[in-house]
Amino acid sequence: MKMNLEKLGERIIEGGDILVEEALELANLRGSALYPLFGAASRIKEHFVGDKVFLCSIVNAKSGRCPENCSFCAQSAHHKTDAPVYSLIDEERMVACAREAEKNGSSCYGIITSGTSIKKGEELERICNAVRRIRRETGITPSCSLGIINHETASALVEAGVETYHHNLETSRSFFPNVCTTHDYEEDVNTVRVAKKAGLKVCCGGIFGLGESVAQRIEMAYTLRELDVDSVPLNFLNPIAGTKLENAENITPMECLQTIALFRLILPTKRISICGGREKNLRDLQSWIFFAGASGTMIGNYLTTTGRAAEEDWQMLKDLNLSVASCCE
Amino acid sequence: MKMNLEKLGERIIEGGDILVEEALELANLRGSALYPLFGAASRIKEHFVGDKVFLCSIVNAKSGRCPENCSFCAQSAHHKTDAPVYSLIDEERMVACAREAEKNGSSCYGIITSGTSIKKGEELERICNAVRRIRRETGITPSCSLGIINHETASALVEAGVETYHHNLETSRSFFPNVCTTHDYEEDVNTVRVAKKAGLKVCCGGIFGLGESVAQRIEMAYTLRELDVDSVPLNFLNPIAGTKLENAENITPMECLQTIALFRLILPTKRISICGGREKNLRDLQSWIFFAGASGTMIGNYLTTTGRAAEEDWQMLKDLNLSVASCCE
């Protein structure tokens, strides 16, 4: 069944959906046969989310000592890695990093903490205070990624001015046991629902190259669609020494782009941002991510790995004739 | 007149031509509207010349002291630049560089000499001897670029085993007087004809970003089509201190890609290789050149500027799932 991507693109643009079997078939495309898939993804993106690029940055506000055993993670206490270990940074530092992110042109700034959840009381309060100051003193939109949360914490974050809560599913339901055995997938799914119920937008995606199959990547995309998340961060594994996946084979650039395009077709109206592992996995093909359907990218450093200088990303966007979305678009 | 690029691509694939006015209209496309143009160029390229990439390298065998006043050229005696000045390198060196180029994966190796023409007698003989040795001792195909030549020189090169003669028109007939006033455009056109008549294939293209208009770029493409050259090297100006164009504004990456695509549509069956100025002008978009219709690229250093390491180009080709054409394909 040779897919007519023009027609499929039009169907999705007119509000129709892509079927799982169609996505699985598109997953078999290779080499230049992928170009029409990218073309369709690009048209769908522009139709639903426009052609501006959304930039975001993060701060690793609390690092290491995580009791979870996620196979890829340098911050897991189950791994011996060089990832820094420190407790929650102070409010001043959170606000200073927000200013730095704004200076770099990011519209969204994520405060990320390692660990299954943050401790109620002092830790949550310090973050909420920082969010309030960031709201008052900068033009950047603060978001938080504090692990598994309940309604009380979610409401506190809303009250402090958090707009978006980030919590990844990391992979598909069927592959998750291969990634993490210290908590259940449904706890992550539930965190997404709790955050939405409290009135937060949800930024939820995952990481590819963990050993999952293409079908499992597609499975994850459909789960995100069911949960109706608001933005989807896509990471590509940057194997870190000391983790279970230190010797994992890198996902190829064209496979990264194919994954982005499939997510765009399955999640046509969502913000899809390319985050961790972009430079490492895409190399010379980084400039293809927007053609493949992404509408945003993280700039600056990642959680435990460094990103390239923001100026290089800005030059790439200029070279692509792409402009940057300002904050709340 | 909104061009249907699908239909235009099919017309060209079926042997039809693109009209000048159609090319001029495509020259107005900007941003993501260029993606379908690249898609059409890519399909046309694959139809006529396949999806393998042709790699070539050159040696600057005689440098500087050129009496011509080409505005872009660091080797012109009319300019004060840092370009090295040396007479014709010896046969041993020419052969050694051929081996280096072969090691880098190039299928074609160009022996280039500055100056209006090379001197008959000793200079020509030394080059012909080197060509004979390169033929015997390596698997790479030697080509020559020795300026304006007559039938006698062309025949000597054929006899020595040269397959392709390189001689650029540099720009369009109408813009040429702005580039060079020390010789006439028709001398270059005639050199192409002389070489073809002697049984040589001809590699003939030019350089963009000299101040020419888009229409003049298109004009040059149609002149090359009339001359029925065999391969078309496209260079993008890398402004060199001391030349008339030292402060020229760089042509943008998308303009470079648009030019490549237009040349593919106008010269559908030809080998189109991206040469000088690729890294400088295309930056993160170097990986788009083949999608835009190019079927080859120069690797290693250029005449008077350095190229990036061959390994980086090989990684880019691998990442694009593109394989390299072996020598005489």
Curated annotation (Swiss-Prot), chains A, B:
Cofactor note: Binds 1 [4Fe-4S] cluster. The cluster is coordinated with 3 cysteines and an exchangeable S-adenosyl-L-methionine.
Gene3D superfamilies linked to this entry: Aldolase class I
Subunit annotation: Homodimer.
Cofactors that this protein relies on: [4Fe-4S] cluster; [2Fe-2S] cluster
InterPro entries: Aldolase_TIM, BATS_dom, Biotin_synth/BioAB, Biotin_synthase, Elp3/MiaA/NifB-like_rSAM, rSAM
Family as reported in the entry's similarity comment: Belongs to the radical SAM superfamily. Biotin synthase family.
Positions that bind [4Fe-4S] cluster: 66, 70, 73
UniProt keyword annotation of Iron present: yes
Pathway of action: Cofactor biosynthesis; biotin biosynthesis; biotin from 7,8-diaminononanoate: step 2/2
Residues annotated as binding [2Fe-2S] cluster: 143, 203
NCBIfam families in the cross-refs: bioB
Gene encoding the protein: bioB
Gene Ontology biological process terms, A to Z: biotin biosynthetic process
Catalytic activity: (4R,5S)-dethiobiotin + (sulfur carrier)-SH + 2 reduced [2Fe-2S]-[ferredoxin] + 2 S-adenosyl-L-methionine = (sulfur carrier)-H + biotin + 2 5'-deoxyadenosine + 2 L-methionine + 2 oxidized [2Fe-2S]-[ferredoxin]
Keywords, ordered alphabetically: 2Fe-2S, 4Fe-4S, Biotin biosynthesis, Iron, Iron-sulfur, Metal-binding, S-adenosyl-L-methionine, Transferase
Any one GO molecular function term: 2 iron, 2 sulfur cluster binding
Cell membrane among keywords: no
Functional note: Catalyzes the conversion of dethiobiotin (DTB) to biotin by the insertion of a sulfur atom into dethiobiotin via a radical-based mechanism.
EC number(s) recorded for this UniProt protein: 2.8.1.6
Residue ranges occupied by any Radical SAM core domain in the UniProt entry: 48-278
Name of the protein in question: Biotin synthase
